[in-house]
């Protein structure tokens, strides 16, 4: 119920503001269970999980956060519009942060696994398709880039991201000495 959730939101707020994300997530999780439509609290819960994942590298925390962000992002009622937009922003932010962390460790397989897990839940995730294609390109797995490149380009909504997918695809064709395909892909780069 709504008022129970509000109590948890207030209790969790102190811990959250003090960046005690472990405590905050425990309290917010109870509130979220009581009222999944309290999107403000849901966002704080998701952020708590993602912050813990960033400091510990625990992918299960990251996945919990993404699941909640996905749920908020999927809400279509106009009253949720602002929080749904924020959920999408934060998903991109934390995914990119996690990717950067893994890239620094040259953990391209970790990035691919993370993207595959996201795509299992949401096959149309432009973000997951994007980071996965970049990881395969960084691994120089050109066959995989060629296999996945067009689908990755097709789901991108941002023209710059779409361009990057075609650029990676063109570079992969080029590396495989497939000149006509490389030229065709590079022509799609804006």
Give residue ranges: language-model regions.
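Canonical positions in the second alpha-helix
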Residues: 31, 72, 117-118, 151-152, ...
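Residue-level recognition of tetratricopeptide repeat
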Residues: 13, 47, 51-54, 100, ...
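TPR alpha-solenoid repeat register
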Residues: 41, 80-83, 87, 94, ...
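Short coil turns that delineate tetratricopeptide repeat
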Residues: 36-37, 77, 123, 157-160
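TPR/TPR-like alpha-solenoid signature
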Residues: 2, 9, 43, 47-50, ...
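Structural motif corresponding to the intra-repeat A-B loop/turn of tetratricopeptide repeats
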Residues: 18, 52, 56-59, 105, ...
């Amino acid at each position: 119920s709504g008022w129970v959730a509000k109590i948890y939101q207030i209790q969790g707020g102190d811990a959250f503001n003090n960046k005690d994300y472990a405590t905050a997530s425990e309290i917010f999780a109870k509130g979220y269970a009581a009222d999944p439509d309290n999107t403000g609290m849901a966002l704080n819960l998701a952020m708590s999980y993602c912050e813990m994942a960033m400091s510990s590298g625990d992918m299960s925390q990251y996945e919990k956060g993404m699941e909640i962000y996905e749920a908020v992002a999927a809400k279509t009622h106009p009253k949720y519009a602002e929080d749904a937009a924020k959920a999408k922003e934060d998903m991109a932010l934390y995914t990119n942060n996690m990717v950067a962390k893994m890239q620094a460790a040259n953990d391209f397989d970790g990035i691919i696994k993370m993207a595959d897990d996201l795509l299992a839940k949401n096959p149309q995730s432009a973000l997951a398709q994007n980071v996965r294609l970049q990881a395969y390109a960084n691994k120089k797995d050109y066959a995989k880039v060629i296999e996945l490149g067009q689908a990755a380009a097709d789901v991108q909504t941002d023209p710059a991201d779409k361009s990057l997918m075609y650029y990676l695809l063109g570079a992969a064709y080029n590396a495989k000495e497939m000149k006509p395909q490389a030229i065709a892909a590079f022509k799609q780069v804006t």
